From Swiss-Prot:
PANTHER family: 12S RRNA N4-METHYLCYTIDINE METHYLTRANSFERASE (PTHR11265:SF0), S-ADENOSYL-METHYLTRANSFERASE MRAW (PTHR11265). Specifically methylates the N4 position of cytidine in position 1402 (C1402) of 16S rRNA. S-adenosyl-L-methionine binds at G34, G35, H36, D54, F80, D104, Q111. It is found in: Cytoplasm. GO terms for molecular function: rRNA (cytosine-N4-)-methyltransferase activity. This is Ribosomal RNA small subunit methyltransferase H. Keywords: Cytoplasm, Methyltransferase, rRNA processing, S-adenosyl-L-methionine, Transferase. Transmembrane segments: none annotated. GO terms for biological process: rRNA base methylation. Its EC number is 2.1.1.199. Its main location: cytoplasm. It catalyses: cytidine(1402) in 16S rRNA + S-adenosyl-L-methionine = N(4)-methylcytidine(1402) in 16S rRNA + S-adenosyl-L-homocysteine + H(+).
Length: 312
């Protein structure tokens, strides 16, 4: 299986924002093919430690090879949503917390470009879409069994697809004739049901995004990480998030705002000072890829990086 090269987005900017203590303990919550992790290790001293996390067994295999190269690195097969409960990190939590956490929420080029993974409408393959190919329901299994109203809800909520109901109806009508098994097949049905294409965007883009997010519980996982982030960071520790679509970025932006300003509550509610506490300081402005990076990697065009620092 030939993989496309994966360019880590905002690599220099994210690592420089993350590594504030070369002797600290860090987490790369989306290891992928190790681009960010290798850059982090290059900035760490001999006492520094880095833990990589990934759902994808293929990414974990790459991480195992990096473990053999560098004793400061360990790979964990799982989700960053479980960060707080990872056994290997409990000693660091007990000792005061992590020096930094980085997550790059984008789908990697190998996942998108390898047809067998089923993420892309550009390459025909099995309609799978699972980040963790060893567990959970495939996209085909869900699409072929879900209620029409549930499909419409997913397309609307996770893809912001305005023709969600029309598409869901077309999907259900077609699966009654023949179940979906291939990405191109699904893309063609969605494409035909898209009444008005967005300029410069494939008509199946939003539907594929929506199903992928739903199958992999991407927003639920992100919400859990945001909820746990302050408690796992040491004072002065950095939280770096790179998001790729508005659903993710809105969640991250709102979280950083609430944690930096102190959460706002309606008047009259019984609110404690702890509930209104400022937990994060926002570092710099939201950052996007520059012209040079865009030339090298067009997929970085929608990336937005936000950085927060844990207050004591």
């Amino acid at each position: 299986m030939n993989e496309s090269p994966h360019f880590s987005v905002l690599l220099q900017e994210s690592v420089e924002s993350l590594v504030v203590d070369p002797a600290g303990t860090y987490v790369d919550g989306t290891f992928g093919r190790g681009g960010h992790s290798r850059a982090i290790l290059a900035k760490l001293g001999p006492e520094g430690k880095l833990f990589g996390i990934d759902k994808d067994p293929e990414a974990v295999a790459v991480g195992k090879a990096l473990e053999a190269e560098d004793s400061r690195f360990r790979i964990v097969h799982g989700s960053f949503a479980d960060l707080k409960h990872i056994d290997l990190l409990q000693a660091d939590f007990a000792a005061g917390g992590l020096s930094g956490v980085l997550v790059d929420l984008g789908v990697s080029s190998p996942q998108l470009d390898v047809a067998e993974r089923g993420f892309s409408f550009m390459n025909d393959g099995p309609l799978d879409m699972r980040m963790n190919t060893e567990a959970g329901m495939t996209a085909a299994e869900w699409i072929n069994t879900a209620k029409q109203e549930d499909i419409a809800q997913v397309l609307w909520e996770y893809g912001e697809e305005r023709f969600s109901r029309h598409m869901a109806k077309a999907i259900v009508e077609r699966r009654e004739i023949k179940p979906f098994t291939r990405t191109h097949d699904f893309a063609e049905v969605v494409k035909a049901a898209n009444r008005k294409w967005e300029k410069g965007k494939h008509p199946a883009t939003r539907a594929f995004q929506a199903v992928r997010i739903f199958i992999n519980r991407e927003l639920e996982d992100l919400r859990q990480l945001l909820d746990d982030s302050v408690s796992v960071l040491a004072p002065g520790g950095r939280f770096v998030v790179i998001s790729f679509h508005s659903l993710e970025d809105r969640m991250v932006k709102r979280f950083f705002r609430d944690q930096s300003m102190g959460k706002q509550f309606p008047k009259g509610l019984p609110v404690t000072e702890e509930m209104k506490k400022q937990n994060l300081k926002i570092i710099g402005k939201a950052l996007k890829a520059g012209d040079t990076e865009l030339t090298q990697n067009i997929r970085s065009r929608s990336a937005v990086m936000r950085v927060g620092e844990r207050l004591g």
